[in-house]
Amino acid sequence: YSPSLTDLQSYNAMNGPALKAGDILAVPLPA
């Protein structure tokens, strides 16, 4: 399972304080 950017955005929206962790996860996807 590979989460899409939309999935990560939804995750971030539900976990406001975890935005930094979400950003770290989102970085490698477009690369």
UniProtKB/Swiss-Prot annotation:
Protein name as it appears in the record: LysM-domain containing protein
Residues in LysM repeats: 1-28
Source lineage: Eukaryota, Viridiplantae, Streptophyta, Embryophyta, Tracheophyta
Organism from which the protein derives: Jatropha curcas
